[in-house]
Amino acid sequence: MKKAAKLVAASVITTLALGSLSAPVAALEAITDTLSVDFSQTTGSFRGGATGTLYGFGDEGAPTQALINGAAITNTSQKAPHGTQHPSGDALKVEDGFFQKHGKDMYIYIQDYYPDWSYHGGVRPADTRTYNQATGAYSNEPNGIWDYLEVVEFVTEAVATGSSRPKDYVFIPFNEPDGGNWYANWSTMKATFLADWKAIYTKIQEVYARHNLGHARIGGPGDTRWQPARSADILTFAKANGVLPDIFIWHELGIDNLRTFRSHFAEYRQLEKDLGLGPIPINITEYGMLRDMGTPGQLVQWLSIMEDLKVDGQTAYWNYAGNFNDNSARTNSANAGWWMYKWYGDLAGSQTVKVTPPALNTVDTLQGIGAIDTKNRRATVLYGGGSGGAVSLKLAGLSSFGTKVDIEVRENTLSGAEGVAGTPPVIKALKGVRVVNGTVELEVPTYDRYAGYQVIVTPEQDRTLEAGKVWAASVEAENTNLTAATVYTQDPLSGGGWKFLASGGRDVGSFNQPTSKADWTVSVPRDGKYRFQIIGATPGTPGRHALFVDNVMASPVQYTANLALTSYQKWQYRGSAEVTIPLTAGQHTLSLRASADGTTLLPNSDITLDKFLLTDVTDGEPTVYPASTLRYAGGAAVTYGVAQARGHGSIRGAGQRADVYAQAWETGYYDISVDYRTTAAAKVGIRVNGRAVTQLSAPRLGVWRSTARVHLVQGINELELSSANGILLQQVTTTRAASADSAAVVVEAENAVRHGTAVVNTYTPASGSNASGLKGAGYIGNGAGNTIEVPRGPGFDKPGEYNVVVSYANAELSGAHDYNPQVVDRRLNITETGSTTPAGHAYFRYTYAWNSFLERTIPVTLHTSTGSLVFGNPTAFAPDLDKLTIAPTTLGTPTTIPRTRIPQS
């Protein structure tokens, strides 16, 4: 292979690093791994089913629709309708959000109808009850029918009559029957299990038949692990009796399963052949350990195996429902795991290709997925894991892209389970790289083995590529100058996988003395505003630190509470805190301290520290989403056939659409700028988070930039672009316009008019609470009269569409479980006096403590000019409220200016 193709030697290459962003010491000392990808050797259609979840959905809107659609989750297992195993996760309540765009298969755990784990005390029910099939109520009297068969009928009937997509359900009669759930002793329970399987299979089909729904899909057996002998017995019986599962299910839980998974799959497929069965689809409905969740370099190892084998899989449910099993953050934000899900979902419509890693069937190694999208002419590699050193990529089979290609490499580093990860930055931008015999080689430095990487290769585009567009730097907390603190090694193999991983493999703890501090000396390029982000874990309470710059107090740092109900959550379930500070160009020492005065500890300041990040936000942190990276629907696609528009997205006509998943660090106003070309006058419609908010326009043929000022919510925002007349889209850019936030109206909840039981809550300074003014409102709801009321005033005194940003707390738990926090998502309704149409509502997820507040945005449509906004819930308690921010969805009139040159990305 000619070395001229190596990117490190080619003169046409632009490689721009992100400021002083540096890898951990361990990563710098590691060896280089090689990953080979041949895009000419396809291995099948991209399946996309490896990012399924177990109880990843909590309630309607928890997670939000933007998170759901962006993650492109195709399958999930949820609670049986009316089940009592967990307070949330009912399949019927979450199906609309799941099926909206990418959802295909809704699985339900029928046994989760029972409240206890193991189910029914771990003992198979007998006939001691009589169930009312209309209501699910039962009396403690036998009726000649096996009790569980009555439960199966009731659950199946609920799906058949209550779901809008009953044919897309998969019923799982048994969950881990080889464990503590009724059939563990195969020598004594085999005959019973087989008879029960047949009876349940038959009953489910009977229910669907009476509703003319055709064949109901059934999955099983659902064992705790691959069980070859049990599986052989079950399949032999099922074949003979005409009750074969439609989906074959088992679990892969543990560290070593990364080594053994492929062999289990091979044994199963051989068993099918031995029994004369055609291949049955497989779903590993529980896989992975805590150490894998939210960690791109771990997740990609699982995803690569499943995509290679073309099986579906669902991450295990180790904590609480509604956050994709620790693969999203806060109420609407991405962590690093979510971005890996999103990247994986971006491969839809592609063909996967041959990938050769350093080793297969080995725990914690460099692994990857390669795919080629021939319609959009995009070749992608996703990879992570390995030694933590640089990765040498050998990319072959690119001849169809021509003699030159563009390459962008994006980096996605570990941010903690609850820590916010921004849009992954471009760390290498490589323009016009010469392709030699269809091959290109490049070397990419690796932050650490837990990071994930996306490499996108396209034919040469008509845009300027740029890495490090926004200056940023980071440092591992353990690599700062520490005083009165301890560095702890977080071994990824310890505890059997029951631990969350730390960036760089270490973190800082025992940060509990008045003299405790972590000093980071860093140079910034210019005078301006900078966001300082700390990734760390609070022990179940909100807390505070003080940030000093050059030994002068610059800002308090406020942390929200993190999950800390168990030993493997406390100090390890890491979130993030962000503050914005002014800095002058040059070197500064940023000092994070447990005390503001050196003698008195700040409230709950004993917080573990993992990583610090510093980002230049002076210019609003413009974030570019190029057309070559977007998702397209309805026939829209990237085109390379138009001069001066190579790599642009062609969007024309009804149904055609480009989807952008734009990240916002804070709720507020942003300028959404669209760069595009037109052949005549054209309009561009923009929907934000499911709502049409604005329309851009170009007057004639030309090259244009149109900009609209739109209120975005903290976290992920789904932008959908369409054009009836047709445009060639180059890119979408979001830029923070913080000065416009003055258009929003802020109302402290304690200052609203209270009705019924609603009271003012007061939080002591010692609590560490992040409540604004240390006050809020509580005991709202659980009765129609228990509300707070906000009279209309300037800023929201006209009918129209608004966002209501709710700062809230919800720490309600219901019942107990061996390891799952039994969280309750609380609902808040907004009504408008004088209008019969509800203004809006949302469910509010768990915040870990009653004095720790997150924010959730409710889109509302107001129909009057004077009607007060009333907040409550007539049937259950609403969350406690801190403050309410009411903002028009857009400001001003969109602008369009001609462009005489191609704007830089």
What are these language model-derived features?
Residues D246, W250-T295:
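Glycoside hydrolase catalytic-domain groove-lining segments
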Residues A71-P245, I249-I255:
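Substrate-binding cleft and catalytic face of glycoside hydrolase catalytic domains
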Residues T362-G416, P459-E460, I535, Q663-E666, ...:
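Carbohydrate-binding surface patches
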Residues R463-Q904:
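Extracytoplasmic
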Residues G385-L482, M553, T836, F844-Y846:
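C-terminal beta-sandwich/jelly-roll accessory domains of carbohydrate-active enzymes
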Residues M289-R377:
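Aromatic/acidic polysaccharide-binding cleft in carbohydrate-active enzymes
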